[in-house]
């Protein structure tokens, strides 16, 4: 992007994580790992049985983590959208009420995570914490195109650069995404990767 005020992190807040998060996908692809993940002394690639174990363990606890991230987004949006409803309320009560559907029911609960959840009050993520999960969905979906066309397919890489990276905030994130994927975002790839589907 030639205009710095439209590039880098100067894009829609729920689109800013897509470029960085999509890169993480290559670190889980055998074809990519074989290019750089090698033994320091022998130069051998990661043994297939070990890589298989890593892949199998990738989703350990994924459903719990998924729900935890959703709960963070939920409480963040709830408190910012309906602030007046929570003024002078006990923080533990608000936590239990708003997040009941996101937790395993327990007779004893710990202290509210709201006491330490600084993202919802500072750092630019106020009412924007959902963007982490949204970006995860976008990058998993966008990577599905790389996976289907070849993770090192030069044409797909150029298309990603042309449609997403080089455009910055010159057009809406939704338009840029549709330019690359030729459709709206679909959560299926993220749910598959997490082992939920």
What is each residue range found by the language model?
Residues 1-197:
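Cation-handling catalytic/transport regions enriched in His/Asp/Glu
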């Amino acid at each position: 992007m030639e205009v710095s005020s439209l590039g880098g992190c100067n894009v829609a807040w729920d689109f800013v994580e897509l470029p960085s998060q999509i890169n993480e996908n290559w670190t889980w692809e055998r074809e990519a790992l074989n290019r750089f993940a090698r033994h320091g002394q022998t130069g051998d690639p990661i043994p297939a049985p070990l890589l298989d174990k890593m892949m199998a363990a990738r989703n350990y606890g994924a459903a719990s983590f998924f729900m935890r991230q959703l709960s963070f987004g939920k409480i963040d949006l709830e408190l910012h959208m309906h602030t007046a409803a929570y003024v002078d309320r006990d923080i533990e009560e608000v936590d239990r009420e708003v997040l009941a559907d996101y937790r395993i029911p327990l007779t004893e609960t710990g202290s509210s995570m709201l006491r330490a959840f600084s993202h919802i009050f500072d750092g630019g993520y106020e009412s924007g914490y959902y963007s982490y999960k949204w970006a995860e969905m976008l990058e998993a979906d966008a990577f599905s195109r790389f996976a289907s066309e070849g993770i090192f397919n030069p044409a797909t890489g150029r298309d990603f650069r042309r449609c997403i990276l080089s455009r910055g905030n010159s057009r809406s994130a939704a338009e840029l995404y549709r330019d690359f994927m030729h459709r709206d975002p679909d959560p299926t790839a993220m749910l598959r990767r997490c082992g939920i589907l």
